[in-house]
Design a protein with these regions (language model features):
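Conserved N-terminal catalytic/coupling substructures associated with nucleotide/phosphate chemistry
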Residues: 1-243
Length: 243
């Protein structure tokens, strides 16, 4: 009976409908009600009586909080199998072929620059308009090429283009700045500038092997680049603020 009450309460209170698996288990000689709810794509799920804005909650560490506006938008897009970066940019009404070609050249140049093996550099293929469409950077709508939010980010034309903020602090706290820099422009350019900034600020040593000297940074440079790139690639651009 209790299981039916819990199941019906969840079904009646939530929207879209949630179908929980409610069971009884024995733990330390006590009967425990276990409620299992599998992840589902129809996000967001909210308390029906409170509405989608006030009734959507998220878990933050060990607390339950009302969802923030940007996160609610993100959940709605995910529930529709859509993503912010692949949405058509609302304030870039058109894009010209010369702008697309420049972005394609710039992106290929970045790939070649970060490819160490010479044979691999020669194997790098051209990036074309069709490739950008496949990636979701551009969209073909009834024969018209439209820019997405990803295109705006890659060309530095986002309405509130986020920036990367880098700083060096004195000691082990963030109370005093020794140096601070802010990098704007296209996101891929920001990654490169932030990477070079970190290399300027960390110590470099050397390793002698035989008659050869190899310069070595105190931190692994591949890890630094990946850390910065991941911060840019995996952040939510619906969330206001910088990196």
């Amino acid at each position: 009976m209790k299981i039916d009450v819990i199941t019906n309460a969840i079904l009646d209170s939530c929207e879209p409908k949630i179908h929980p698996n409610v069971t009884l288990q024995i733990l330390d000689d006590k009967t425990v009600i276990v409620v299992e709810i599998q992840p589902a794509p129809m996000r967001p799920y909210y308390i029906k009586s409170q509405g989608i804005v006030k009734g959507t909650y998220v878990r933050v560490a060990g607390t339950t909080r009302h969802v923030e506006e940007y996160m609610l938008k993100e959940l709605i897009l995910e529930g529709q199998n859509r993503y912010y970066d692949s949405e058509i940019c609302k304030y870039l009404t058109e894009v010209h072929d010369n702008e697309i070609e420049k972005l394609c050249r710039d992106m290929k140049a970045i790939v070649i620059k970060n490819t160490l093996d010479e044979s691999a550099k020669l194997a790098v293929r051209d990036i074309t308009k069709n490739v950008l469409i496949t990636w979701g950077v551009l969209k073909d709508v009834d024969g018209k090429i439209l820019p997405t939010n990803a295109y705006a980010l890659l060309t530095g034309q986002m309405l509130r283009q986020p920036v990367i903020q880098c700083a060096v602090f004195k000691g082990n706290t963030r109370a005093y700045f020794i140096d601070r820099r802010e990098f704007d422009g296209p996101v891929q350019q920001q990654v490169e500038f932030a990477y070079q900034y970190v290399l300027e600020k960390i110590n470099m040593g050397m390793h002698i092997k035989g008659i050869y000297r190899q310069d070595m940074y105190e931190l692994p440079v591949d890890g630094i680049r990946e850390l910065i790139a991941n911060a840019v690639a995996h952040r939510s651009y619906l969330e206001p603020g910088n990196i």
